């Protein structure tokens, strides 16, 4: 038999197999049921799925019930579909003032008290760079206020600012500091936007082990005027008045489950399918008086994709195992996924791929926008799955937005796991996106449900292609996460 004929036969067999997979998804997919999940998760009943509101328990319970009903199982040793997370809810102070020399900063206007207890007094100031261990060398900060630049070198995305700050608080406390002030000097993210978002109750992972934290403060210093004055000794002390600070402990829930693969060897590897199920809750009413931010696009549609995948793969398990994850508190700083990445219920080196979902909206129903397309060897599998349902996969059209590093996938990419985000189709961050993004208008009634169905089905097929692939997905050569990936998986 000629090589050409052999190749044609092989291609025909492969094409038949792919078509069979698509047909299997089509026949198993209950469109009305999927849309009913969508309507419930984006309903007023859940009050915008804010992790600090009691309705969030109903959302997590609903997702776990679907996992159980469809046949996904609890992870060994968990005795639950939940990964409980110790959160700390810190409300703004009733009074917040920090005076540096002749300049007084007031809460919400140049000052944000983000965490910690009340504090009143006059304290010495010590500048310690970015607040990392090496920055403390030769410096006595006991009983003083540590002053640092916000974020960390080359880590200035919004998510990075929060994660770096949490690390700094712990280190400053161990060094004996009474408070941490970060000077906010990131002009790319306007202070007014930051203040509007953060001058409200803040949620963090509680790493205090029952001990009291220290005040964590941001001061507006876009021109580095204040931090330079402190560093030169022109300003040596701060008068601090933080009163009425309330901190409360609550429990958050990641919803997790697995479906075991069929291959005796490959079933020890996991394809993680994830989406955050929280949103921003209740806020400022729009012109129609609607104050519930339902979050259909962001990210009920993604949560439903994971629920649909649970149903399909429980009845049609692939060669590799499937790890299903619905994250909490993405909107609070990627907290749920971050907690899992540091406290994994499955060894990270066994998670060979993360197909994450997060969304702000869509403006093109002929495409799927894959944030991270072009960075892993699994690209053709995703592109083919999307094409099989009549759509086209495109890469990030707005790299200046830094979307890859603003969603849950980045917590796993940093560990070395290939992790693109499978998003609704958008070609730019235009008015069609912003009129729904974090707005009360983001509800199911304004969503193209025919497009949602294609999106959900293509997600399942993409996951199936990866889970059945004979090769293990890798980062493309030269990617910034390639080296850490080789460490994780033990590759040369």
Which residues fall in each region the model found?
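Catalytic-core environment of secreted peptidases
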Residues: 26-46, 51-74, 138-140, 144-151, ...
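Noncatalytic luminal/extracellular "stalk/propeptide" segments of secretory-pathway proteins
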Residues: 47-145, 152-154
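Second-shell loop/turn segments in exported
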Residues: 22-28, 44-54, 69, 86, ...
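Soluble metallo-hydrolase cores and metallopeptidase-like ectodomains found primarily
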Residues: 22, 104-107, 112-138, 204-295, ...
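His/Asp/Glu-rich mid-to-C-terminal helical/loop segments that flank catalytic regions of hydrolases
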Residues: 311, 315, 430-491
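Metal-dependent peptidase/peptidase-like ectodomains
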Residues: 214-225, 318, 327-431
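Bacterial Sec-dependent N-terminal signal peptides
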Residues: 1-25
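Extracellular/luminal Protease-associated
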Residues: 107-208, 260, 397
């Amino acid at each position: 038999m000629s090589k050409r004929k052999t190749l044609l036969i092989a291609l025909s067999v492969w094409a038949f197999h792919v078509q069979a997979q698509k047909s299997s998804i089509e026949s198993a997919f209950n469109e009305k049921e999927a849309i009913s999940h969508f309507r419930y998760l984006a309903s007023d009943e859940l009050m915008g799925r804010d992790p600090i509101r009691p309705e969030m328990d109903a959302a997590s319970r609903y997702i776990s019930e679907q996992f159980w009903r469809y046949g996904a199982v609890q992870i060994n040793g968990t005795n639950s579909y939940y990964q409980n997370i110790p959160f700390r809810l810190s409300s703004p102070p009733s009074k917040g003032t920090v005076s540096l020399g002749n300049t007084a900063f007031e809460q919400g206007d140049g000052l944000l008290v983000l965490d910690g207890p009340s504090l009143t007094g006059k304290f010495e100031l010590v500048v310690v760079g970015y607040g990392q261990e090496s920055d403390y060398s030769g410096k006595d900060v006991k009983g003083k206020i540590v002053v640092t630049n916000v974020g960390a070198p080359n880590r200035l995305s919004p998510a990075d600012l929060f994660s770096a700050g949490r690390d700094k608080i712990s280190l400053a406390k161990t060094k004996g500091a009474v408070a941490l002030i970060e000077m906010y000097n990131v002009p790319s993210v306007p202070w007014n936007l930051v203040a509007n978002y953060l001058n409200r109750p803040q949620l963090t992972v509680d790493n205090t082990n029952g001990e009291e934290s220290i005040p964590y403060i941001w001061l507006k210093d876009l021109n580095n005027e204040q931090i330079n004055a402190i560093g030169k000794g022109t300003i040596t002390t701060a008068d601090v008045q933080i009163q009425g600070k309330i901190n409360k402990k609550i429990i958050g829930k990641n919803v997790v489950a697995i479906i075991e693969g069929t291959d005796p060897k490959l079933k020890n590897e996991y394809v993680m399918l994830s989406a955050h199920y929280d949103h921003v809750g209740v806020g400022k009413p729009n012109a129609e008086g609607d104050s519930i931010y339902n979050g259909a696009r962001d990210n009920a549609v993604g949560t439903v994709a994971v629920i649909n995948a649970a149903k399909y793969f429980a009845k049609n398990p692939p060669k590799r195992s499937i790890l299903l994850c619905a994250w909490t508190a993405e909107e609070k700083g990627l907290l749920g996924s971050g907690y899992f990445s540091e406290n994994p219920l499955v060894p990270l080196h066994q998670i060979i791929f993360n197909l994450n979902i997060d969304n702000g909206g869509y403006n093109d129903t002929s495409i799927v926008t894959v944030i991270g397309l072009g960075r892993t060897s699994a690209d053709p599998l995703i592109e083919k799955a999307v094409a099989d349902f009549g759509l086209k996969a495109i890469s990030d059209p707005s790299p200046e937005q830094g979307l890859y590093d603003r969603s849950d996938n980045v917590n796993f990419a940093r560990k070395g796991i290939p992790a693109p985000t499978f998003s609704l189709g958008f070609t730019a961050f235009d008015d069609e996106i912003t009129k729904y993004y974090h707005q009360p208008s983001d509800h199911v009634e304004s969503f193209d449900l025919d497009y949602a169905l294609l999106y959900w089905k293509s997600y399942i097929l993409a996951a199936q292609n990866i889970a059945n692939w004979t090769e293990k997905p890798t980062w493309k050569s030269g990617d910034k996460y390639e080296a850490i990936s080789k460490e994780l998986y033990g590759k040369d």
